[in-house]
Regions:
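Helical element adjacent to the flavin cofactor pocket in flavoenzyme catalytic cores
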Residues: 2-49, 53
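Short, hydrophobic alpha-helical segments
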Residues: 21-28, 136, 190-198
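A short local loop/turn or secondary-structure capping micro-motif enriched for an aromatic residue
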Residues: 38, 114-117, 179-181
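Active-site substrate-recognition segment that forms the wall
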Residues: 54-166
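C-terminal catalytic lobe of FAD-dependent flavoproteins
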Residues: 142-214
């Protein structure tokens, strides 16, 4: 790793964040479909502000937003002892082998210009598994725990965007395939704007906060 760099297990992080929210008395409502029209920030009985992080669910209010399909494979490989994320050079897209706890590895991800959420294709599965096997023969006897498909919310320039809608609504979208890497910088920029109406953090990270973009 580079100096000061680290790695994390994304699922463990999400669970830790969830428990932290619950510990602070935050009510979390899963699978509750909402639109911006369901809220009137600042009015009596309504939240003071609204942060819209719906990804592709915000397509109607986020011009240029599209889905980019990604597939990943989760394996249990007791014979493999990789301890650091490994990037493979692939002709179609970047592929990573990400080690998790107890010899679990995530291999991914494909990058296909479609928001199709059908099950993973044979081609993609073969590419990911073959890539893993070329790195370590121990993957030949690995057990497939999961093959998952999802679509990444992506803007035209493949960069994230913060958009101010009205006085009390902030949209954050377009994190593409860099969510866990760039999220801390976006959080700093968003908090700076929400708490202080300042763009200093956004400017420091090279992010642009756009005003009143429909």
């Amino acid at each position: 790793l580079l100096p000061g760099e680290g790695q994390l297990d994304n699922r463990q992080l999400l669970e830790a964040l969830h428990q932290s929210l619950l510990g602070q008395g935050v009510q979390v409502h899963w699978h509750s479909s909402r639109t911006l029209e369901d809220f009137r920030p600042g009015e009596p009985g309504q939240p003071d502000g609204l942060i819209d992080c719906r990804g592709l669910g915000a397509r109607a209010q986020c011009e240029g937003l599209r889905g980019v399909r990604g597939e990943v494979v989760r394996l249990h490989a007791p014979e493999v002892s990789l301890a650091r994320p490994t990037r493979l050079i692939h002709p179609r897209y970047p592929i990573y082998i990400a080690p998790k706890q107890d010899h679990v590895f995530v291999i991914g991800a494909t990058e296909i210009e479609t928001d199709d959420l059908s099950p993973p294709s044979v081609r993609s599965t073969l590419e990911l598994l073959s890539a893993a096997y070329t790195v370590h023969p121990g993957f030949a006897e690995a057990r497939i725990l999961e093959i998952a498909t999802q679509a990444r919310p992506t803007l035209r320039d493949n960069l994230p965007a913060l958009r101010v809608r009205g006085r009390n609504t902030l949209q954050i979208n377009g994190l593409y395939r860099h969510g866990f890497l760039i999220a801390p910088a976006l959080m700093d920029a968003a908090l700076d704007w929400v708490l202080h109406r300042s763009r200093a953090q956004a400017d420091a990270w090279g992010l642009h906060i756009m005003d009143d973009v429909a």
